[in-house]
Amino acid sequence: MKRIFCLLLLLFLLPLPCARGEAAGEDPVVSQARQSVVHLYGMGTDPETGRRSRWTGTGFAVGIAGEESDIYLTNWHVATGSGKYADGQVELWLLLDDAQFDSRHRPAEGSAVKCRVLITTDGYPDVALIQALSPEGSRKALPLRPSGEVPKGTAVTALGFPGLDATRQGADSGPEDLWVSSGIVREHLAMHSAGDSRTIIHTAAIRRGFSGGPLLDSQGAVVAQNTYGFEADVSTELFCALYIDYGMELLDRLNLPYTRLDSSEDTPSWFAGLLHGHGLPPGAAWTLLILDAGAILLVGLGLFKAARQLPVKIPGGGNKGGGIP
């Protein structure tokens, strides 16, 4: 039976269509989102052997869209080192641009902001909320859109930082250093090998280090969290993102405010998200809204026809999944 593996087991040494750095003519929505995504770095110590492990991941600011926030969503395995360590044995940092490390592989002074874990799912579905512990760790929050409202064929963009190997000589962790890839939503799937977690299957390539990062729609709303890939003999062109609804549930449990965009409702918060995503005044935003609606309809019809000719079958079962730090 085919098996779904964690990103650590994928053949990410193969070239993937991810672009590093901000490109000329980049979509303003993506350029805006870069300011909200952060590079995370963790270290765990085994209390018995004293052996230390390191990992990296990605997170993004949540709260009232466009306002500064020190609260971030990421994956549970990024925040905790996959739960391998006892309480107090894990340290987590938000890396700043041009971060440097000392001889013990800890971030040098001024290179990072210490973080604390607020709440996690304690395993599947692999989600965590963390908080940066100094003002330098604040970023503008992104709006969230329930994943179930995102139809097949929707254009999406994945953002993330490179994995641990990229930190050997320091870390380029600024907004301009993010890797970006684009694709479309292919399917909604309950991932049996990951605790029946609800996921979006998409074609925006992700690689090691993307774990916990955002999957955006064309309005700049986070519709899912990049977490898993598939074993190479299943697919090297499909990728898996957790429903953002899991992150919303954690925010609700802590009574933390955030901007939720609902496609089925014309609400002030939805319109505020449009203004934030495009940086436009109200009059121009309404014009853009009408134009976007027409464009989405035309593109959607074309993608629907293509999707019918390319059915996707993804077998479940096998080993338990788990993203890579």
Predicted regions and their residues:
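Active-site substrate-binding loop(s) of clan PA
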Residues: 24, 28-29, 60-62, 82-84, ...
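Flexible, gly/ser-rich surface segments that form the specificity/activation loops bordering the active-site cleft
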Residues: 140-198, 206-208, 228-237, 310-311
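A short, Trp-centered hydrophobic/proline-enriched beta-strand micro-motif
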Residues: 31-48, 156
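Cytoplasmic C-terminal tails of single-pass
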Residues: 309-325
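Catalytic-histidine neighborhood of serine endopeptidases
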Residues: 67-122
